[in-house]
Curated annotation (Swiss-Prot):
The keyword Cell cycle does not apply. It is found in: Cytoplasm. This is Digeranylgeranylglycerophospholipid reductase. Its main location: cytoplasm. Its EC number is 1.3.-.-. Pathway: Membrane lipid metabolism; glycerophospholipid metabolism.
């Protein structure tokens, strides 16, 4: 009998397993893939604050350090933002293959059992416990646990069966494609974001430096607005921008841009990370929120074991923690995202022109909003309930 079984060894799952094990719980962490951290399905960016509040930074899993972001409007108007203003995805670019394994190793060091090539086939709640059916190398076996934590990604089998989440609609998920490229000639102290409805309908393109002339070059599009695949939009972006380099890796995937879900718990069950749609609806970034959610899930699991109460009512303490941390931001950024996808390229150019050339490092958010409102007064009405 385990206290906690965690499914999925990404940042959320490994963090949950590590935190629960550190509280003295008997923990099992399973990952269906052969290697933790592969394939990489994100741009790998995270702010310094988001990573340093949980870990002592190890240069082995830092691919690059960036000091700001450059954002390009469709007409190439450039906006330069400081690291502090650029959000949760700017500061470090991680080497996710190494970082994810590092967090899983910390979970094991804390006492968690970690199995790779192990998939969750099914689960059943019975008599206040959860029976979890696992499959490894073609063999099935069952384990019993008091708490099941689903960190099994955007299409969470656990979340759907528990009735916590439903299948996402085409306007609630971004389709993403990304190349790892080498031989690039870029200033590696910045991350780069490219906007435009023609370029990336409902999303944006990005370049995240990884050092030594390499970078993640990717794009995210909203399937409801897109007329082609994400990869086709990515290839068109690279050709249009004249990006010359060698493609050494390709990944594709989906990122939830749902916003804040009502609850991430059911009896005996908690969801964390992409499984709970914790990714930022504007940026699609999810590492920072996943780490925080995993930490909160592990802490609440320990409290539940101590109280011997695994009901949804008790586990809603987890909802309170993640909602108080980043729930408001998810709600706000979902509303901003809905406004953003309505903007045509002409309006994006106009807004960018209103703040381009200004020293944003010395401007408050309120001052920037004021400049944007001068360029587009209707924004004041559209966004009145966000600030």
């Amino acid at each position: 009998m385990y206290d906690v079984v965690v499914v999925g060894a990404g940042p959320a799952g490994s963090m949950a397993a590590k935190t629960a094990a550190e509280q003295g719980l008997k923990v099992l962490l399973v990952e269906k893939r052969q290697e933790i951290g592969t394939p990489v399905r994100c741009a790998e960016g995270i702010s310094r604050e988001s990573i340093e509040k949980f870990f002592e930074v190890d240069k082995k899993w830092i691919a690059a350090e960036v000091t700001g972001a450059k954002i390009y409007a469709p007409n190439k108007t450039e906006i330069v933002m400081s690291e502090e203003m650029a959000g949760n995805e700017v500061g470090y670019v991680l080497e996710r293959k190494i970082f994810d394994r590092h967090v899983a190793r910390l979970a094991a060091k804390a006492g968690a059992e970690v199995y790779v090539k192990t998939a969750m086939v099914d689960f059943e709640r019975k008599d206040g416990k959860v029976k979890v059916k696992l499959r490894r190398l073609g063999e099935d076996w069952e384990v019993e646990t008091k708490i099941l934590i689903g960190a099994d990604g955007v299409e969470s089998k656990i979340g759907r069966k528990a009735g916590i989440i439903k299948t996402l609609k085409l306007n609630e998920v971004e389709s993403c494609a990304q190349y790892l490229m080498t031989g690039l000639d870029i200033d590696e102290s910045y991350t780069y974001f490219y906007l435009g409805r023609e370029l990336a309908p409902g999303g944006y393109a990005w370049i995240f430096p990884k050092g030594n002339g390499s970078a993640n070059v990717g794009i995210g599009v909203l399937p409801k607005m897109a007329e082609r695949t994400a990869k086709e939009y990515l290839d068109a972006f690279i050709e249009k921008e004249g990006i010359e380099g060698k493609i050494v890796e390709f990944v594709a995937g989906a990122v939830p841009v749902y916003g804040e879900i009502e609850t991430a718990v059911a009896d005996n069950i908690m969801l964390a990370g992409d499984a709970a749609y914790h990714a930022d609806p504007i940026t699609g970034g999810g590492i920072a929120n996943a780490l925080s959610a995993g930490y909160y899930a592990g802490k609440v699991a320990a409290e539940a074991v101590q109280k011997n109460d695994f009901s949804a009512d008790f586990l809603r303490r987890y909802d309170e923690l993640w909602k108080n941390d980043f729930g408001k931001k998810l709600r706000r950024n979902k509303k901003l995202q809905l406004k953003f996808i309505d903007m045509d390229d002409a309006l994006l150019n106009k807004l960018a022109g209103a703040i381009a050339g200004k020293n944003l490092r010395e401007m408050s958010v309120a001052a920037i909003v004021k400049e944007l409102l001068k360029a587009h007064p209707k924004l004041l009405w559209d966004l009145k309930d966000l600030f």
